Each structure stands twice: as C-alpha cells, then as structure tokens.
Curated annotation (Swiss-Prot):
Pfam families, alphabetized: tRNA-synt_2, tRNA_anti-codon
Name this protein carries in UniProt: Asparagine--tRNA ligase
Keyword Aminoacyl-tRNA synthetase: yes
Family: Belongs to the class-II aminoacyl-tRNA synthetase family.
Originating gene: asnS
C-alpha cells in the first residue's frame, strides 16, 4: 500500500481515486455522532487537511478506537480514497485501519475555540500547530528560500558572518556582552548587531556579497516592531552608489513578494481571511509599482510640517526641525497618505542620525543614506554608501568618541584599494510581518526574544 502525503492527494485527486493509501499525521479535528466519525488529519505537507471517515456499521473496530482519540494525537491511517466533487474537499479517505501512534492528553491547550495572540505567544512551542501560525511559518520558509534564490541568480556570494564579535557595528552601544569573554578571548566580546563589516571585507574581493543570519540588539523596547533577536538580509556591493542600492532593494522586494505569492498562495489566502482581505492587494500594488518614489529627508520634513500646520494630520510629535528622527507615525503618513500606499525611499539623512561608517555628502550635513518605508509598518530597510576615505572615517569616529582599537582592521581596509562600497540591511522578520498582515513582529518569528522574558 502506497504511503502518500495530503499535498499529493489534494494536488492530483483523480490519480488516487479508489486507490488504497496509507498516511501518517496528527488529528486536527474530530466530529463524532452515534454512528459516524470524521477526522481532519494534517501531515505538515499542506495547510489543508485530509478528511477521513468511518461508519460504525462498516468498521466497528476502527470506530471504537476513534471514539477514544484526542485532538493532536499522532496516527497512521489506511484506507480507500473516494472522490467527493460536491464537497468542500475534492476527496476523502474511507478508513479501513487506524494505528494510534501517540495519544495526546485531553488537556491539549489548542482546543477548538478562539485564542488571543498573547495566549499563542505564551505557547510558542505549540502555536505553529494552529492554522494561522502554520501559514506564517510556511511563508517564512518560502521567503528564506527566495532570498538565496535571488542572490545566487544574480551572482552574489554568500558570506557567513560571525555571531561573536569584538565590534559594535552600529556604534549605538545596545549590545549583548558575552560573559567571561575577557578571560576567554582576552577582550570584550558581543553578540553581533550586524554582519555588515564582514560583508564589506568580502565585497572587496568578490564585489557582490550577502549575509543572511541572526542579529542581536539589547534594546529595552516593548513595541510591536522590535525584537532582541531577529534576522537580517545584508547585501554589500563594491563600486556601488545610492542609486544602485535603491534599484537592488526594489528588485529584491518585488522578487521576494512574487515568490511568496507563487509558492504560498494557500497560506496567503488563509491569512487574508484571518486578518485582512487587503493583504494580497497590497502585495500586488508593490509588485506593480514601476518605480518606488524617492524623496530627500528635507522634503519629507517639509511635507510633514505642511500637513501638521494645516491640521490635515494630528501627529504626536510635531517638531519638524532639521535633525529630528522620523517616527513610525511620520513614516506611515508619508507612505499611506501622501504617496497613497506606495513604498517610499527617503534619502540623505542628517549625519547625526546615522552610523559613523556612512559617507558624508558634499554639504557636510547629510550622509548618502537611504531608508525604505512600507505602508502599515514604516521603515523596513536601511542602507548607505560607505565612507571610503580613511582620514574622514577616523575623524568621524573621533567626533563620536568611538574607540577605534577594535576597529583597526575595518579602518585598514581603506588603505588597500577600497574605492567605494554600498550596502543595506533588510529586516527579514519585519518584511515577513508585512507580507502576512501581522500587527506584531513577535508573531513572525518562531520563538520571539524580547526584553524582560525568555521562556523557550
């Protein structure tokens, strides 16, 4: 008897008509009456389940066994596939035999009722069994695969940057310090906040590289946009400028969304029904946007100030003097209202707002930096041209009181053929949250790490 998956059965139902099959999986749902029992069986191959049925008069032994089976139990089932063209599913399994592989206890937390998001977060080890989070994590996998597909297709080299580092790449001081690193490594060691520095080094040999891995920030933030451990996509290209960077960002975002829509359409439809029917139309809007709009930081301030002054919008923060850091409310207004739900590039930020390694523009006030803003989420991606002049970089570090002892290797690269380099960091979990229509980034990662708690 052939072992098959739910995915195979649903993709080609006619192929299995009247065939005997066996399948292993978990009981997602059970409906029972006096003389008939229906099981919904999931095997992980599809977001959809296989309906299995047995009548007491046809198979009293199997009927009796299934009366005792609890939700989440693991089973092996055998039977005959019957086509059901008038039902919701194209087929069902007429049970002949059932083996109860692991009986779940009756207090299984994910019973057939509504649960809050906080309930699911407190049961992160189980929530992937719920249809919503099954969909999110399947899309996470599809999105991860698409990242590698895009970069390899475009001749980028993968750099596996270290998790342990002696550098604070962003210079913000929000790092996790490794205990006993002074005695083990003979210097203070951190969990990485970015793979950028390593990527820059490799870009000077391969020209086009990327990293994709976990990063860590010791920010005590309790917003729906922040995690202490999250994943970053960080390409770096030698001889590139801001224009090249924005084209790469736009191409990458469109490619990733297309791949999700092609390879996880069932999962997107589930999330659209669960959260918002706008999810899919929003994704289509991004794909169809020929060129993402671009505005200067100073222009963004002028737009925000005009809207605030004319009372078109009531911002919580109304100070729009040069040098203010744009808040999420400002970013969302620009994307959603002024640019009518389009992605938006904002470029040339004040150098005081950005990291020390960004190239200073000729006005000596701004840096060649870019952020990509998306509707409903705000900033999702940030990048820049890198400062290639060694003396300029040293002066910048000095003005910010950055100790360069652990950065000597990074500075030294400028001595030996470092003409130009540009790169960006794209928040993988934020992008996933946007694609899935999630309001909280904690629901986009398997086991969220946030300030104040770590339970798994």
């Amino acid at each position: 008897m052939k072992s098959v998956t739910v995915k195979q059965l649903l993709q080609t139902p006619r192929k299995f008509n009247n065939k005997q099959i066996k399948l292993s999986g978990w009981v997602k749902n059970k409906r029972a009456s006096a003389n008939i029992i229906f099981l919904a069986i999931s095997d992980g191959s599809s977001i959809n389940t296989l309906q299995a049925v047995v009548k007491q008069e046809d198979n009293p032994q199997v009927f009796s066994l299934l009366q005792t089976v609890n939700l989440a139990s693991a089973v092996m089932v055998w039977g005959e596939i019957i086509l059901t063209p008038k039902a919701k599913q194209p087929l069902e399994l007429k049970l002949k035999q059932v083996s109860l592989l692991a009986q779940a206890e009756s207090d299984y937390p994910l019973q057939k009722k509504e649960h809050s998001q906080e309930f699911f977060r407190s049961n992160a080890h189980l929530r992937v069994r719920a249809k919503t989070y099954f969909a999110v994590m399947k899309i996470r996998s599809v999105l991860s695969h698409a990242i590698f597909e895009y970069f390899f297709k475009n001749d980028f080299i993968l750099v596996q940057s270290p998790i342990l580092t002696s550098n604070d790449c962003e210079g913000a001081g929000e790092t996790f310090v490794i205990k006993d690193s002074e005695t083990f490594f003979n210097k203070t060691t951190f969990l990485t906040v970015s793979g950028q520095f390593g990527a820059e080094a490799f870009a000077q040999a391969f020209k086009k590289v990327f990293t994709f891995g976990p990063t860590f920030r010791a920010e005590k933030s309790h917003t729906n946009r922040h995690l202490s451990e999250f994943w970053m996509i960080e390409p770096e290209i030698a001889f590139a400028n801001l224009k090249d960077l924005m084209q790469l960002i736009q191409n990458l975002i469109k490619f990733l969304i297309k791949k999700v829509m092609e390879n996880a359409s069932d999962e997107l439809n589930v999330l659209a029904k669960q959260f918002s029917n706008d999810i899919i139309s929003n994704l289509k809007t991004i794909i169809s946007t020929k060129k993402f709009p671009i505005i200067e930081y100073s222009k963004a301030l002028a737009i925000l100030k005009e809207s605030s002054d004319t009372k078109k919008t009531n911002f919580e923060l109304n100070d729009f003097s040069f040098g203010i850091d744009l808040k999420t409310e400002h970013e969302r207004f620009l994307c959603e209202q002024y640019f009518q739900n389009q992605p938006l590039f904002v470029i040339n930020y004040p150098k005081e707002l950005k990291a020390f390694y960004m190239k200073t523009n000729t006005d000596n006030k701004t840096v060649a930096a870019v952020d990509l803003l998306l509707p409903k989420i705000g900033e999702i991606c940030g990048g820049s041209e890198r400062e290639s002049d060694l003396n300029q970089l040293k002066n910048r570090c000095q003005s910010l009181n950055i100790d360069t002892k652990s950065l000597n290797w990074y500075l030294d690269m400028r001595k030996w053929g470092y003409f130009a380099s540009a790169g960006f960091g794209l928040g993988f979990d934020r992008l996933l949250a946007y694609i899935c229509g999630l309001e909280n980034i904690r629901d986009a990662i398997p086991f969220p790490r946030v300030h104040g708690t770590i339970n798994f």
